[in-house]
Regions:
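Pyridoxal 5′-phosphate
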Residues: 1-383
Length: 383
């Protein structure tokens, strides 16, 4: 199989991720922070070590403000619902994933908040000045996608963050597609909350994600339960990480995430991104010359991730995906990619979305050559 669905989940994982997860679960797979025996202490060291590693990765200050969840969707739900209050105004964009759109829409339908959805330009970018113009006196937060999972554009977060910071608006950054793909410094970007997932560019397993919440952000807890400490207290704990965590963590996921981040750092984020974008350029250039293929991407690889959406004239994207799989053993994603507003803007919502090819660190030139040849064959059906 040629795997070109890395924007959904990176695959395969680095060998050290498999090895570390297996060793961890065989030798340290017990609950942390609940007991004083050696294995429990060692497990807690892995958990805190991963908090510390990711805090440094994003240039945060306090590892306890780094909390774990199931994935980015889970954390976005907690952050959005934990910050929003009746009468608030929230800014977001038409580039967002349903992990942002649906929690906001739920609160909007209830009458609790108002939401402004900012458009993106023909190249796929948000204009920071549109953010400035959208801010009201009651704007609580802006929830913005760092990188589109459909068209791959990386947004000008530093400029957007500066505008939000000046206006006293919290910037919540969805780094699902960017964490591990490009360097992220939340201080330099003026980010107040960053949400991430482990199973994409951080090269970890599924079922693990989280957020880093800066200490000036008054997010409330929205879940209640066991924390392993101060069990006699009737109310949920206010301090981090317990404020956003309850119950036993996905310890195997935490361990795998730790190994994945280590691998990314060992390889070098810029080195990985440069290699993937070289293949993206090759793929894009190869497909531009084929009749009946429409590409949905920026005209330059600057501020771009290795994600390419396309369509074949006269063919449903799902049918193209089936042909790629059955006839060419190429795995990709088709449809709306859980980002319906993107497709409304680029005009693909009425034709069942796009075919998305997304490149990862283990793809090769041979993979790209095969993808170009396969698309040329499929496109010839409509010549």
């Amino acid at each position: 199989m040629i795997y070109l669905d890395n924007s959904a989940t990176s695959f395969p994982k680095p060998e050290m991720v498999y090895t570390y997860m297996c060793d961890f679960y065989r030798n340290h797979g017990v609950s942390p922070g609940r007991s004083g025996f050696d294995a429990a202490i060692e497990t807690e060291e892995v958990v805190f070590g991963t908090r510390k590693l990711l805090t440094e990765f994003f240039n945060g200050d306090d590892p306890n403000r780094l909390t774990f969840s199931y994935n980015a969707s889970d954390s976005l739900n907690m952050i959005i619902q934990g910050l929003a209050e009746p009468g608030d105004h929230v800014i977001t964009t038409c580039l967002e994933h349903n992990s942002v759109l649906r929690p906001l829409h739920h609160l909007e339908l209830s009458g609790m908040i108002e939401v402004t959805y900012l458009p993106f330009d023909a190249r796929g970018y948000i204009d920071p000045d549109d953010v400035r113009k959208a801010i009201r006196k009651n704007t609580k937060m802006a929830v913005i996608n760092h990188c589109s999972n459909v068209i791959g554009t990386i947004q000008p977060i530093r400029e957007i963050g500066a505008i939000c910071r000046e206006a006293g608006v919290f910037l919540v950054l969805d780094s699902t597609q960017s964490a591990g793909a490009i360097p992220i410094d939340i201080k330099a970007l003026n980010v107040d909350v960053i949400v991430f997932t482990g199973h994409k560019c951080l090269m970890g397993p599924t079922g693990i994600g989280g957020s880093y919440v800066c200490d000036h952000v008054p997010v409330r807890y929205t879940r209640f339960g066991g924390t392993g400490v101060r069990s006699a207290q009737k109310t949920h704990l206010e301090e981090f990480p317990y404020r956003l965590e309850c119950g036993t963590l996905n310890l195997l996921g935490v361990a795998g995430l730790k190994a994945g981040v280590r691998w990314v750092l060992d390889q070098g984020i810029e080195t990985l991104h440069r290699g993937e974008m070289r293949l993206w350029n090759k793929l894009t250039q190869g497909l531009r010359d084929i009749d009946n293929i429409t590409l949905y991407c920026a005209d330059s690889d600057k501020n771009h991730n290795p994600v390419l959406s396309l369509n074949v004239r006269g063919l449903d994207s799902g049918d193209v995906g089936i042909m790629l799989d059955v006839d060419h053993s190429i795995a990709c994603r088709t449809g709306l990619q859980c980002a319906p507003k993107v497709h409304e803007v680029i005009g693909t919502d009425k034709i069942h979305g796009t075919v998305r090819l997304s490149i990862g660190p283990f793809n090769t030139d041979a993979d790209i050559d095969a993808a170009i040849a396969a698309m040329e064959e499929i496109a010839s059906i409509r010549r």
